[in-house]
């Protein structure tokens, strides 16, 4: 079996918003990497045994007295090191160079003139001006290196940053003041490939097929002949976990699908058809609609609704697990960003620390071992693996759906009548987006039920019925988002169909709020 962890890159995180992007780019190249807080110990690095190390950017300033530094062992480990932005600055300072606050901060596009040959820039240039190679890059820095450490040479300059890149070829230490991980740096992926593959010597074995083979082998080794229970929602993460476990242990996997009455139109039937009929999984459907709606009756506060939905799910799931007397393991769809966010750094600078719903959220009364086959994977990697396992692209690329489902898309109190109206309206909206080619152009689109009545005219009569708001956004990272400029004729068609086909809706509006100030979901 291929050892997909044999060659690996260690990324030390100094707090940059782009650090996870570095990891995703390295994985994209085909090499395993892990992202750790900057204040790791020499012992931890030795134990991990990286093939190369990347130092990330940071919002901190190297000129501040207590700003973070790389462990000294990084520069004595005998492996190549790449410093990015702040990472380059701390490398320079720790090896005897100097950094200062710049009079001219650089934020945005810049053109770096390449000087002196370096393995990092081999075969890279975006344009040749008077035979001088240049790279189009993305800068984001207020400090700059003003004196090189011993044995370093300048390999890149800009008019306002004389040392925009540096290298010590003998020790294989490299620094770039720009961000190769962002797409705005045109040759960024090629630069990272030069470092990871050509300089560090990593083999590109991190592929979907190899990851599946490794995951199946590890599941078999972990659980043996034991039985495993999984809460299967039909979302991408739990679906991929289900198929990996099914491949590894077959009927020893027990999938529990909790139908909470807060799902999209026909979603429960689709989950059963897909995983029960098509893939032949051992799956139980629990109709818990009345239990969820009963607990939600009279509750209108969004946070209270979320907590109730979470608690009832755990209770229902636990009731099912008690029926399975031989189960020893609980499978979860925890992915790598969950692990990163929940990792407790000593300083708190490296990551936002928060309790994630998939990490550490288990009730005390479920004393089962944890199986987490996706805990090393980013979301885009989970999708690739899902496709390789045979999940349909339409399902893999479906827009995000909140954990509490329609519980947070019905504003205020949740009632079955409201959910049924919303389901049908939303299905029409999504159907028309797909038919017009706009579903793939938007990052997330959905309908919201507004608990207000509006007057409408149907035939000769007036009626007071409910209002639906349509929401569609375009975003790269879901941290910020723009409302999607859907064509008027498309919006008109959706509105007309909803009002005519969904009895109980008299008005349809379109939400044109960006994030910020508004959030993507209404609740």
Curated annotation (Swiss-Prot):
It catalyses: XMP + L-glutamine + ATP + H2O = GMP + L-glutamate + AMP + diphosphate + 2 H(+). One of its GO terms (molecular function) is ATP binding. Keywords: ATP-binding, Glutamine amidotransferase, GMP biosynthesis, Ligase, Nucleotide-binding, Purine biosynthesis. Residues 206-398 form the GMPS ATP-PPase domain. Residues 8-205 form the Glutamine amidotransferase type-1 domain. InterPro entries: Class_I_gatase-like, GATASE, GMP_synth_C, GMP_synth_GATase, GMP_synthase, GMPS_ATP_PPase_dom, NAD/GMP_synthase, Rossmann-like_a/b/a_fold. The active site is at residues 85, 179, 181. Its EC number is 6.3.5.2. ATP binds at residues 233-239. Pathway: Purine metabolism; GMP biosynthesis; GMP from XMP (L-Gln route): step 1/1. The keyword Ligase applies. GO terms for cellular component: cytosol. The keyword Phosphoprotein does not apply. Coiled coil: none annotated. It is an enzyme of class 6 (ligase). SUPFAM superfamilies: Adenine nucleotide alpha hydrolases-like (SSF52402), Class I glutamine amidotransferase-like (SSF52317), GMP synthetase C-terminal dimerisation domain (SSF54810). It holds the Pfam family GATase. Homodimer. Catalyzes the synthesis of GMP from XMP. HAMAP family: GMP_synthase. This is GMP synthase [glutamine-hydrolyzing].
